């Protein structure tokens, strides 16, 4: 794990629709080691390494869930809307960062009412999104505007990256900066002249997998590996039958989500690669969410796709948590798969005639 790169990516502000900070980091990281960097029309980052053989894409979405300023009242408080999926009980009194239209960072906090001022009934009722506000310490609308904050500015949770103990990494936007970091590490270290390797940082995954569709059309890949996070079911309050993944017990292979089924030959290939290299591999399903695989697998008549994920505690909140060991195992697994890939193997993934 390149912990410095992951920290840099996690501390960037890059809410869906405003991914520039992560895009810049990926450009600076990968420009020295790839043949070409291009972008699709929505802004997805596409790095190409090699120029012959089948096109193999490794995809990690750049965007994170966050908010947008929708109103500034006369007292200087900001109203906002959510971008991506949030649970209102995970938001109150958390610090946030407003990225102004000029790129400046303004700190704020999602305000909460002191318990002394709440009735017993109010204490039992969660606050709706529409009732929430952000306080940046301003005393008026004019003061807010002088700081450069305006309607339409994007808001992300405050950066809080840390390593806890020997194995855990904590921070905002691990969904899906771990995918971006791993994609970059693979582009830096995999050298296989049999394939053309693409690293993709897609945009707007959290609001509808939009960059997956546009980047798929841009590249037209032959095989796609999607990197993402998945719910860890090892904490109190989560059904560990529906969510069986546990941090520290290996990465996960997504068997299906709301928009995707993996190519079964790809699944078998990764199972075999994990066994041969003595790497742990868990399995997961997701009925209520989707990954970029849901767009890549239906583009251009259909493509072989597999989604691989890291078990993550506290997704779509201010602080997620992953295992370093899981990250390293997944990196080793995919590197081993890509290093031994040939045109013949890639072609076989799309052969569906039963052979006697």
Task: Kindly label every feature range from the protein language model.
Residues 1-356:
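N-terminal hydrophobic/helix-forming segments and targeting peptides
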